Amino acid sequence: MTILGTALTTNATKVMLLGAGELGKEVIIECQRLGIETIAVDRYANAPAMHVAHRHYVVNMLDSEALKQIITQEKPDFLVPEIEAIATSLLVELENNGQKVVPCARAVKLTMDREGIRRLAAETLHLLTSPYQFVDDEAAFRKAAVEIGFPCIVKPVMSSSGKGQSVIRSEQDLTSAWTYSQEGGRAGQGRVIVEKMIPFDFEITLLTIRAIDGIHFCEPIGHRQEKGDYRASWQPQKMSDIALAKAQHIASKVVENLGGYGLFGVELFIQGDEVFFNEVSPRPHDTGLVTLISQDLSEFALHVRAFLGYPIGGIRQLGACASAVILPELSSTNIVYTGLEKALKANRQIRLFAKPEIAGHRRLGVVLAHADSIKHAIEEANLGAQAILAHDGDNHLSR
């Protein structure tokens, strides 16, 4: 029997979030609904999840000693990584000494870079993937691109939100693609993956939950990416029964191998009835923000329920729904918004993340929509997102 304590009491159940972005904010909110004591950690102050946590810390999470000091001080019952740029060797050490890491330290370590999870999927689990090579320098990169053939894609083994990722259509693109890949990697990593570009029909995220009562799947989520980053998502994504069965089989094999309890975002390419494995995140997925409106239990609620050790039971999908990103371009440390009255129509919702600053393009929120069809839901979400404008509050006169 799992015992759940009350926040800010002697027997409080504590969850420490490593990475305090918009996805983590929703995880914290779900923990708060269960009376859990929450601690948010990130590399910068006033990150979204810090706004709703009981306490927060600002630290470089690649610094093992600094991170260990905070964890030792707080003694959380659950360590919940929200991002990849964490000292994973420390998580392994802590787990070996009895600390609960969500879903488990091995899953976090394997998925922190593209090489670990791609080799697991293709070489250990023998799942269908695009042809690929991992390389460390420009000469090897050029050779790999020619051998794999054009068009191909280059990605840093450690990056997120499409940083450093580009499509190479000919040898003329190689120099710029290599330079960009080196600028976009996390944690000083120069290694990249070069992979064949698959002519897929569409790509999906299959949110897969490993819980005490078995494996559960959400309905497939379709999404649109630009420059490797999510711009819109919708659920359910229509696909053949054969492809769906293959997708669920692949997702099951991956999450069962990774282990632990929690929600996993399994990214797949669909080509007719064929399914190719792409990547997996052992945590809620940005495309899954649509589940805030499309399901009775969002991906965040499912993640929390699973890692606490409680059964999922069932997941009810509520019809055609979509999300669209609010992605302005400006520079400000005092962001204000207009246009919400235009965006807030029937069957639309808004989530503003309260990010403290912006320099260039940055995802500041999403609009969620429910409609009678996926096409109309996408249109409604996009119209809502376009209506919301972000401004520098220091210079905006009509506040």
UniProtKB/Swiss-Prot annotation:
Cite the binding residues for Mg(2+): E267, E279
User: One Pfam annotation, family name?
Assistant: PurT_C
Query: Where along this sequence does the record place binding of ATP?
Result: R114, K155, S160, S161, G162, K163, G164, Q165, E195, K196, M197, I198, E203
Identify the residues that the record assigns to the ATP-grasp domain, covering every copy.
119-308
Query: Highest taxon of the source?
Result: Bacteria
Q: In which pathway does it act?
A: Purine metabolism; IMP biosynthesis via de novo pathway; N(2)-formyl-N(1)-(5-phospho-D-ribosyl)glycinamide from N(1)-(5-phospho-D-ribosyl)glycinamide (formate route): step 1/1
Name the InterPro entries on file. Answer: ATP-grasp, ATP-grasp_carboxylate-amine, ATP_grasp_subdomain_1, PreATP-grasp_dom_sf, PurT, PurT/PurK_preATP-grasp, PurT_C, Rudment_hybrid_motif
Coiled-coil stretches, from where to where? none
Q: Which residues bind N(1)-(5-phospho-beta-D-ribosyl)glycinamide?
A: E22, L23, E82, D286, K355, R362, R363
Molecular function terms from GO: ATP binding; magnesium ion binding; phosphoribosylglycinamide formyltransferase 2 activity; phosphoribosylglycinamide formyltransferase activity
User: Quick one: a GO biological-process term for this protein?
Assistant: 'de novo' IMP biosynthetic process
Q: Say yes or no: keyword Isomerase present.
A: no
Family from the record: Belongs to the PurK/PurT family.
Job of this protein: Involved in the de novo purine biosynthesis. Catalyzes the transfer of formate to 5-phospho-ribosyl-glycinamide (GAR), producing 5-phospho-ribosyl-N-formylglycinamide (FGAR). Formate is provided by PurU via hydrolysis of 10-formyl-tetrahydrofolate.
* Self-association and partners: Homodimer.
Name of the protein in its database record: Formate-dependent phosphoribosylglycinamide formyltransferase
**Species assigned in the record:** Proteus mirabilis (strain HI4320)
Q: Which gene encodes it?
A: purT
